[in-house]
Each structure stands twice: as structure tokens, then as C-alpha cells.
Swiss-Prot record:
A GO BP entry: mismatch repair
Protein name: Ribonuclease HII
Main location: cytoplasm
Known function: Endonuclease that specifically degrades the RNA of RNA-DNA hybrids.
Localization per Swiss-Prot or TrEMBL: Cytoplasm
Transmembrane segments: none
UniProt EC number: 3.1.26.4
Length: 204
């Protein structure tokens, strides 16, 4: 599969700066949802970049450094569990994506606006040409790169959250609803970073 096929078509149409955008943590019971947007140089193909869920943590970390080194610009958007409970997870994910696009920054600290955005199966409320690509992290290198950046940054946050809330095993399951996590919730109750709207069936 040519992971630049979609990007190549857009470059041929005259779009120069093409961003990939993806989110991580949508299905978690705990913590923020996080999105990343990445703009890579025209024509650059990075070996091994694919959907972050198909990579080992070690390989994700390695590729994160390669992406960071080569990216024209990167941006991250984070939406808290509290806001997720207020506006629902889909809207929170879209807001995180929008924030990640608006926070795109070059290595020199300058803001960057892309000509076009490729988004993993979602539309962003922003006045920039875009396409929602189903299974985008498999079909577009830009979206796959964004998925890796988002996953690495959120996993690092999970390690920090685990130190603050040691009863739940967050570093191990990253906030997802594993048996260990559900049992800890029943034993200790939810922390302030748990998504109350996700816990109704567990804590009924």
C-alpha cells in the first residue's frame, strides 16, 4: 500500500502544505482525549509509519522522534475528562482535533496553517479544506504520523497520571476499561480524572 497516495493526489492538485490529524483516548474511562496534527515535507516517506495501534511502544517512541525531527510543524490538542462529560466524547474529540490544528507550530516556534487537512474518519469545525478518511491511519502517512504522536504523548501523560492516582493501574492499561481497571473502580471509586459519563454501567 502506498501511504502517500492520498497526499500525492493533493500535491498534484496544488495543495503544498498537507496536514494529517488523528486522536487517541476516545474509548478510555480515564483522562483526557488527545489529538495531534502533523505536517511532513512534500514527498517524504518515513519507513515504518503506520497506525499507532499496530506498533510496539518502543517502535512508537522511535518513530515519534523521527517524525518530530522531520516534521515541518506539529500541534497537540487536549480536552479534559470534565469537558468530555459536559459535551460528549465525539464533540470533545473534534474539539481536540481543532485545537491541535490551531496549535500547529514549526521548529522555530512559528504558527503554521496547512493548505489541506487529512483527518481520521472525522470532520473538524475549521475553515480549512479537509477530507475525513475512513481507516485513515492505515491509508495516509500523515494521519498515521499524527496517530503515533498523539499516542506517545498521551501514554507519557498516563505514566504521570499513574503517579498521581496509583490505585488504578493507569500506566498499564492507559485508562481503558480493562478488568483490572473496572475492579479498581469498584474498590476505590472514581478519581477526579475519570469520565463520569463513561462509568454509569460499571458503577450502577
Amino acid at each position: 500500500m502506498n501511504r502517500l497516495e492520498i497526499e500525492n493526489q493533493l500535491w498534484e492538485e496544488g495543495y503544498e502544505s498537507i496536514a494529517g490529524c488523528d486522536e487517541v483516548g476516545r474509548g478510555c474511562l480515564f483522562g483526557s482525549v488527545l489529538a495531534a496534527t502533523v505536517i511532513l515535507p512534500k514527498g517524504l516517506l518515513i519507513e515504518g509509519v503506520k497506525d499507532s495501534k499496530k506498533l510496539s511502544p518502543k517502535r512508537r517512541e522511535e518513530l515519534y522522534e523521527v517524525i518530530k525531527k522531520n516534521a515541518i510543524a506539529m500541534g497537540v490538542g487536549i480536552i479534559s475528562a470534565e469537558v468530555i462529560d459536559q459535551i460528549n466524547i465525539r464533540q470533545a474529540s473534534r474539539l481536540a482535533m481543532k485545537k491541535s490544528v490551531l496549535s500547529l507550530t514549526t521548529i522555530d516556534g512559528e504558527s503554521k496553517i496547512p493548505d489541506y487537512i487529512l483527518v481520521d474518519a472525522e470532520n473538524i469545525d475549521i475553515a480549512i479544506p479537509q477530507s475525513a478518511i475512513i481507516k485513515g491511519d492505515d491509508r495516509s502517512q500523515g494521519i498515521a504520523a499524527a496517530s503515533i504522536v498523539a499516542k506517545v504523548i498521551r501514554d507519557r501523560l498516563c505514566i504521570r497520571w499513574d503517579e498521581e492516582y496509583p490505585n488504578y493501574g493507569i500506566a498499564q492499561h492507559k485508562g481503558y476499561g480493562t478488568k483490572l481497571h473496572r475492579e479498581a473502580l469498584l474498590k476505590y471509586g472514581p478519581s477526579e480524572l475519570h469520565r463520569r459519563s463513561f462509568l454509569k454501567k460499571i458503577l450502577k
